[in-house]
């Protein structure tokens, strides 16, 4: 702690000589504004690769389409999650050193009207305006970088014309201090069958990630545990995502790389449900199963600070206005699959923290290895031109058009649900004997 304070003081002291130049820049910027020349500043959200790539690619597309005017100057804020991405952005944007630009931004904020000189934090990595399909990718490799990538692929055993699939499975090693996102974690072992299927079809499979909880123990010469075998590099983490045949993911920030290069995506175990990246073409999605506990009676007795509650064959705890359920004391009969309408009505489709699901008495169940294999096989067939997804019109007409912070989450819908997953989810609800309104509505829609 003491070292940190000394370091911060030293940084502030070193910046003192820059105060006058920064103030002169602010003065110049304000004077230019009087003559109709707009100069604006903003920070990259550098610490998260999803925002460093996704937000900025959307911004640059908007700029190309005339949605942003003026001279824009950017700087990094915080630790840079990918030096390769930072280097590539510098080729197409004005990026100033953070130690100086931060002072410019702070001094500018000391005077009225500072908002005119700020781009504002672009926190949207979604594409409801459909800008990605109207613009070319802005991340571009140099000739030397392409040669470097090809040479590395050769070292890894890939020959000319070989295709590969990126596999990105979020686990507990990703942002371990932010446990409220743990509901998004999955077990990479459940992807073994899908990886082997792809390898047998001739694809190389690269398990991606910079820091992962455990190795991907699947033995095949075309399956590479890039995240754990010591071959990972910041550069290849971008290169592989840029040129993959498609990417299989559970939805992480790294996905922004293949998305920015307009690569097809196959999402599995996706949550939150209403945040599905609907704008992606040539892509498929299946989501985690949402299960609702059905409590039939509650005992009016306080137990360890909560009311003891019983289901037909197990028990949980009522704490305040929500139910904390103990999985080891509940059986499968205590859980009921939720329909799309029930997910939407409960608010679970927009839940962003694990505790939200706990409060609502909802448990998320991962996709099975069979479900993952099925949708990845369908994706490979689609990429190879062996099949094409249908429009799924009825489903997408009912899909909730949610908004977040007054911004729409969806525009034109291009992604499709895995065909077998969609069919079986509906069949599952039709066989549900609970008689719920959601089940009846779903049965009517799929009759």
Model-derived regions, located:
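Catalytic donor nucleotide-activated moiety binding site of glycosyltransferases and closely related
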Residues: 167-175, 188-233, 397
